[in-house]
């Protein structure tokens, strides 16, 4: 907490008086307590909550603003004592970050950009401009030549549509569901829907380089995987299983793909945005005789 400076607060107080003149203009209204606090910002704008992946039993409740303090404290306490909070905190899970998202350079770049947008009107699809191109797929250059429009997911540049497929919009017409509202049409293109329709008619290749990949290996690998996923894990070697992952209360945590590579060897492929949290979920539930090996950066 820093000393309160009225000069910094006066412009905001004048704006508040315009919005609530009857309340703040009342002669009985007064400032009981005033602080000049620092804003805690994170690379993606969400708090940093939960047990750290690096140290068992070390919990974080960081980047929590005053107005969210009581609710956050309750949720984290539930998480610590019961294993799951009453509300979903997946977007704020400290385990969500990839190693390249925790570097000092990345954190500084993103939080500096976030500060400017903190009280702005930010479109849900709006992309960060800072520190881009830190993770590129092997076919990135070819995708760019095809007119790919890249969005970032967990540091990876992923094509959301290809301008070279613009002709498909005319082919499918209204089936592309064009968006007439200007706000809805920001950070979007009807080419997205046209590409989906074309793939349903023919075939296509989807770049999944940004997905998280980790193996579960050991004599207890089958028991470990079966304890975590909903689908049957005891399948023939070479089979691929698409399955939900539930928590202890039956709540939905994730959907992912599991491949059985050997009797005691399973490979898990899951989304890039939540994949590191999925890896921690598996790691926390490994019995003696099974280990998790992260292969995300091995390709």
List PLM regions with ranges.
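Short, well-ordered beta-strand elements
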Residues: 1, 59-62, 266-271
């Amino acid at each position: 907490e820093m000393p309160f400076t009225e000069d910094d607060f006066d412009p905001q107080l004048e704006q508040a008086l315009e919005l609530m003149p009857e309340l703040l203009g009342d002669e009985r209204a007064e400032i009981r307590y005033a602080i000049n606090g620092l804003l805690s910002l994170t690379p993606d704008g969400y708090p940093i909550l939960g047990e750290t992946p690096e140290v068992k039993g070390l919990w974080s409740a960081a980047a929590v603003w005053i107005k969210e303090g009581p609710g956050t404290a309750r949720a984290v306490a539930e998480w610590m004592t019961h294993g799951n909070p009453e509300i979903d905190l997946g977007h704020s899970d400290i385990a969500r970050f990839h190693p390249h998202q925790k570097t000092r350079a990345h954190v500084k770049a993103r939080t500096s950009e976030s500060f400017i947008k903190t009280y702005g009107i930010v479109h849900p699809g709006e992309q960060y401009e800072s520190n881009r191109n830190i993770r590129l797929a092997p076919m990135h250059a070819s995708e760019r030549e095809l007119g790919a429009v890249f969005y970032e997911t967990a540091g990876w540049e992923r094509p959301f549509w290809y301008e070279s497929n613009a002709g498909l919009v005319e082919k499918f017409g209204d089936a592309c569901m064009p968006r007439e509202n200007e706000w809805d049409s920001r950070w979007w293109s009807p080419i997205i829907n046209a590409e989906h329709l074309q793939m349903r008619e023919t075939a296509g290749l989807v770049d999944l380089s940004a997905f998280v990949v980790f193996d579960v290996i050991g004599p207890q690998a089958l028991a470990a995987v079966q304890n975590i996923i909903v689908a049957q894990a005891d399948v023939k070697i070479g089979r691929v299983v698409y399955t939900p992952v539930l928590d202890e209360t039956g709540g939905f945590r994730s959907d992912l793909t599991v491949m059985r590579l050997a009797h005691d060897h399973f490979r898990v492929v899951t989304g890039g945005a939540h994949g590191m949290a999925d890896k921690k979920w598996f790691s926390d539930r490994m019995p003696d005789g099974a280990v998790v090996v992260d292969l995300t950066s091995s390709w």
